[in-house]
Amino acid sequence: MMAAANGFSRIPMPTWRWLGVNDLPVPEGLTLPSVPIQLSAATGERVHHVAELRDSGVQEIEVTVADGAELSLTYIQLVPTDVSAASRIRAAVGKGGRFSCTLVEAGAQHTASELQVTLAGDDACADVWGLYFGDDARKIDLNYIIRQEGQHTDANMQVRGALLGHCVKNFRGTLDFIQGARGSVGKEDEEVVILSPHAHNRSVPLMLSHEGDVDGHHAVSIGRMDADKMFYLMSRGLDERAAQQLIVEASFAPVLARITDETLRTEIGDYLERRLLGGTQGE
């Protein structure tokens, strides 16, 4: 998969150029590191890693999951909201291997993130859950891809997001069934809550199939705060921002529940709460 000259990621099957979603550019002033972080799980091994990006810059991670191994990765991006960040995670999963990934993209003025998982072996599995949050005039650019090459592979991609203020967000989610991936199944679902009429949302769900004997499903749910729902919540004693916070927290809960480090999970929850209560909704 070739990326554009000014970027580092591209959707597997480019669409109309005028949509502006084919390529994912690196934020201005950032370059990818020459040596990525290497993570691996040997045959029969079960390992868990946490990767955090808290300063402006770029992080690249390469993951190798051997036959019959399991690797779980939690990736947290809490970069200060006045600087940019970019990340790339690529994982290869062997026969009977399992890769679980939980991603939180909550910081940065401009964030660009690629996740590419290749289920190379038969019976390989990928379970991906992602969360993004944008407010003010921030830009979020995400490209998540699961390639299913082996037979009887299983892919699950679940993404939850919330947009406030004048935030601009592009999310590309792809399930790519390669020829020979007979008996494979895949599910992709993105749910985004839009809390401002000025937020700009682009969702690009793709399901590509070069194999007939597969079962794939993808969906996007875009929710806006309607007057009736807001009236109901406020009639129960909540002000507008507290009502919005309740809805967003309910959406994010399944993703945050996967973070086993209680201290880290609490930190992220508190961080999102401060942003929700202090951010701009309809200005």
Q: What is each of the regions a protein language model found here?
A:
Residues 3, 282-283:
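Short, Lys/Arg-enriched, disordered terminal segments
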Residues 19-21, 181-182, 247-248:
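Short cationic/low-complexity microdomains
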Residues 26-231, 235-238, 259, 265-282:
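Conserved beta-strand/loop scaffold segments within soluble protein domains that form the structured core
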Residues 16, 171, 251-252:
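Aromatic-residue hotspot detector
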